[in-house]
Swiss-Prot record:
Biased composition range(s): Polar residues: 439-449, 456-470
Coiled coil: none
Record's protein name: pH-response regulator protein palF/RIM8
Encoding gene, per UniProt annotation: RIM8
Task performed by this protein: Required for the proteolytic cleavage of the transcription factor RIM101 in response to alkaline ambient pH.
Biological process per Gene Ontology, one example term: cellular response to amino acid stimulus
Matching InterPro entries: Arrestin-like_C, Arrestin-like_N, Arrestin_C-like, Arrestin_domain-protein, Ig_E-set
Organism from which the protein derives: Eremothecium gossypii (strain ATCC 10895 / CBS 109.51 / FGSC 9923 / NRRL Y-1056)
Residue segments, region Disordered: 439-470, 497-516
Family per similarity comment: Belongs to the arrestin family. PalF/RIM8 subfamily.
Gene Ontology cellular-component terms listed: cytoplasm; cytoplasmic side of plasma membrane; cytosol; plasma membrane
Molecular function terms from GO: protein-macromolecule adaptor activity; ubiquitin protein ligase binding
């Protein structure tokens, strides 16, 4: 009985926080009317080492004693498993957590003292917290996980034994990625040989020889195994893909140069397909949990493939755009997830393979327009199907750069189905998507002759550019070259069939050639048009003079 009276006496003589902890009649829940965080710049995207400023707003209906406010900045990594209603938390990790007291003390020196108190009304507490520079990644949220950062504040008792109320505010963090420091990529080459020739070539070797030794012997001197080298190199297709840079900024145009060395003349209206791909990999947490991989095709470019009958070579320039809504390359180690970008180039080396889009629309079919190919007396003029201009998309008033034509972001070619077909080969090159490019660093690297830009190995692309034969920079340049460069005007997309095959290229200042009908093409008038023309010639009403 005495113990109970003593406890009630201590409770009455203590602070309101003690009454709440031990079940007093005053409640902190009813005392707090509003509790939130106001950021100095609510729409700012923060970077490492930036200082987040703002105010904590606390509105009380009644005074409180013995309380403190603790500010925190925390980053969390969450990985989900499953999809939809079956989604559940698979893994969670705290990237960093830092806190500081903005009102009150950590631990009071005397447990009997009442500590800090707050009166009734509005209270504003300014704060400043610096974003760390280590173990931090760009904010992201998707179906399989998220990386989030939040500024929070906790109203607690003076000893920190109980959290009375809390509030938080999400912030967006962007980790800058400078692509000017990345080295230049070397061209990637793919060699395609006939399976029958490989089987016949392997029969001439001992059983212990492998495919790698076969490749080495085919590139050896002509004195050893000359017969096998001749057979394997006679029907070999070499595809070389070259990228000018290994890193690109959001909004950049990726210029791809493709060089093909064929063993015969070949043409295909949808022979080359370049795709900007984003691969997401969700790492496993154990042996029983496999790694998940997801693919997203961002944009695509389709170009015609025409192998010259004399040289059996083809050089094509293709363009891809990094969209403005893309996010930088993200790699989170230690059971996290990664987002990496790749340039995938496919070569369709069979005219029998039909290229379909996601909506089952055929590209390069019989409904395409034809453009003439350069010919000679020995090689007659042939035709190749040209992709329709509607694939280029509607051009705006300021979109006068035709280098971005034939780049589409919707209704793309189903690359997975196309790769399963025969005589379809290709390669993929990883690129880094960054946030900015330091132009001064890039210019210094280009001006320095000893900088390792392209390595010591010279490629077919560099040899051709050094010899003076500049490669085309866009798909439309290929069309102009195939049509004997009828006009170099950017806006002249209509081909004029009446020009002679040996006419030279025209400059921008030259007058446009006049149209002359070509006798090689049979032109027949439509029957309906003839009837409409006859009806127009007939007089619908008698003239006034005849009536008089």
């Amino acid at each position: 009985m005495h113990m109970r009276l003593f406890s009630k006496f201590k409770l009455h003589g203590s602070s309101a926080a003690s009454e709440e902890v031990f079940g007093g009649k005053f409640s902190y829940t009813s005392a707090v009317a509003d509790f939130y965080i106001e950021l100095g710049d609510a729409h700012k995207i923060w970077k490492p080492r930036d200082v987040v400023t703002g105010e904590v707003v606390l509105t009380l209906r009644k005074p409180l004693r013995g309380v403190s406010l603790r500010m925190s900045l925390e980053g969390n990594l969450r990985v989900q498993t499953g999809s939809g209603a079956t989604s559940r938390l698979k893994f969670q990790r705290t990237l960093f957590s830092k806190s500081s007291m903005i009102y009150g003390v950590e631990q009071p020196e005397d447990a009997e003292q009442e500590g800090h108190g707050l009166t009734r009304g509005d209270h504003r507490f300014p704060f400043r917290m610096r974003v760390p520079s280590k173990n931090i990644y760009t904010s992201i949220a998707f179906e399989k996980g998220s990386i989030s950062y939040a500024v929070g504040c906790v109203l607690e008792t003076r000893s920190g034994a109980q959290r009375l109320s809390s509030c938080s505010r999400q912030i967006s963090v962007l980790v800058p990625v400078d692509v000017s420091l990345l080295p230049k990529l070397r061209p990637k080459t793919v060699v395609l040989q006939s399976p029958q020739l490989l089987r016949s070539a392997k029969a001439n070797y001992p059983e212990h020889d492998t495919a790698s030794s076969l490749t080495k012997r085919t590139t050896a001197s002509a004195n050893s195994n000359s017969s096998v080298t001749t057979v394997c190199s006679s029907k070999t297709v070499t595809i070389s893909v070259d990228l000018p840079e290994s890193g690109y900024v959001i909004g950049d145009t990726i210029r791809i140069k493709v060089h093909i060395q064929h063993y015969k003349e070949y043409r295909n209206s949808a022979g080359l397909i370049a795709t900007l791909v984003r691969i997401c990999r969700v790492h496993s947490t154990g042996t029983d949990d496999p790694m998940e991989t997801f693919r997203k095709d961002i944009c695509q470019c389709v170009a015609p493939l025409y192998v010259e009958p004399e040289t059996h070579t083809c050089s094509v320039g293709m363009n891809l755009n990094v969209p403005l809504d893309a996010f930088p390359t993200l790699v989170v180690p230690n059971q996290g997830f990664t987002f990496q970008y790749y340039i995938e180039v496919l070569a369709n080396l069979s005219s029998k393979n039909i290229v379909y889009t996601e909506s089952n629309r055929v590209i390069g079919g019989s409904g395409m327009a034809d453009i003439p190919m350069p010919g000679s007396k020995l090689h007659p003029v042939k035709k190749i199907s040209m992709l329709p201009l509607k694939l280029q998309g509607p051009l705006g008033k300021q979109d006068t750069n035709i280098d971005e034509s034939l780049i589409f972001f919707q209704d793309m070619v189903n690359v997975d189905k196309l790769k399963r077909l025969r005589n379809v080969t290709g390669t993929s090159i990883e690129v880094v998507i960054g946030t900015h490019r330091n132009n001064s660093v890039q210019q210094a690297r280009q001006s320095c002759p000893g900088s390792p830009v392209g390595g010591s190995d010279s490629t077919m692309m560099s040899e051709q550019s050094a010899a003076g034969t500049s490669l085309p920079s866009s798909v439309l340049d290929i069309y102009d070259q195939l049509a004997n460069r009828l006009s170099s005007s950017v806006g002249d997309q209509l081909l004029r069939y009446g020009m002679s095959p040996d006419s030279g290229p025209h400059s921008a200042n030259d007058e446009l050639p006049r149209y002359t009908p070509n006798v090689d093409y049979m032109v027949t008038e439509d029957k309906r048009e003839l009837e409409q023309r006859k009806l127009k010639e007939l007089e619908s009403e008698p003239s006034v003079e005849e009536e008089q």
